[in-house]
From Swiss-Prot:
Pfam families: Peptidase_S51. This is Peptidase E. Keywords: Cytoplasm, Dipeptidase, Hydrolase, Protease, Serine protease. It catalyses: Dipeptidase E catalyzes the hydrolysis of dipeptides Asp-|-Xaa. It does not act on peptides with N-terminal Glu, Asn or Gln, nor does it cleave isoaspartyl peptides. The lineage of its organism: Bacteria, Pseudomonadati, Pseudomonadota, Gammaproteobacteria, Alteromonadales. Its EC number is 3.4.13.21.
Length: 237
């Protein structure tokens, strides 16, 4: 079996309905997967039931059977029984903390390596990389480790934008990712813009959507990755 993982930058683009832009990206992963488990642990400011309902509504046209992991007495068994795994956005630190709390980090990696499709957006994409050291989120809780699912052997930065508001004197996103590459110059970081996604199919990695991505690695800073690029070489990192 081969890894089949879709890593979305965001759940929305502009004012579009929740997950609407992602339907064409998600649909191919559902061909042989009807029963999905949704992991809402990144959702801190809403109830897990509310979060689940928004996902079910957003993906309703795909007619999937989606349940929340919080509805199952045994989270590990719920992962094993599902045909596919969905992880939504929110706070990446809280998400990873809970994945460690229920001992799901290694299990999810193993299940995806066996061919179980994985779909994540925002925080759900952050945790798919080597670690969460390039998340945008506030560290509201401390997970046992920053090491993540390792579905791709590099770092991700969803919602990537280097916009700086006039008069604002804080660091830009590019400056913050530069700091990471100074500390860890050998590990690539891919910034994915809202509306785009990375899709790993075994040894193939593709950039989906109509926006470029951006690569940071060592002395290479904010290198544009053209729309439709084959990024398979990053899987050999």
């Amino acid at each position: 079996m081969t890894i089949n993982a879709l890593l979305l930058s965001s759940s929305r683009v502009g004012d579009t309905p929740y997950l609407a832009h992602a339907i064409p990206f998600i649909k191919p992963l559902t061909t042989n997967a009807q029963k999905w488990i949704f992991i809402p642990y990144a959702g801190v400011s809403m109830s897990y039931d509310t979060y689940l309902a928004s996902v079910v509504t957003g993906l309703s046209e795909l007619e999937l059977d989606i349940s929340g992991i919080h509805q199952h007495p045994d989270p590990q068994q719920a992962i094993k029984d599902a045909d596919g795994i969905l992880i939504g956005g929110g706070n990446t630190f809280h998400l990873l903390h809970q994945l460690y709390r229920y001992d799901l980090v290694t299990l999810i990696g193993e299940q995806v390596a066996l061919g179980k499709p994985y779909i994540g957006w925002s925080a759900g994409s952050n945790v798919s990389g080597l670690s969460i050291r390039t998340t945008n989120d506030m560290p509201i809780i401390e997970p046992p480790s920053f090491n993540a699912l390792n579905l791709v052997p590099f770092q991700l930065n969803p919602h990537y934008s280097n916009y700086q508001a006039p008069g604002h004197n804080g660091e830009t996103r590019a400056q913050r990712l530069l700091e990471f590459t100074k500390v860890d110059p050998l590990t690539p970081v891919v910034g994915i813009v809202e509306g785009s996604a990375l899709w790993r199919q075994g040894d193939k990695l593709s950039l989906l959507g109509d926006q470029p991505a951006y690569l940071f690695c060592g002395e290479q800073q904010e290198i544009p990755i053209p729309v439709g690029s084959d990024l398979s070489h990053l899987l050999k990192a």
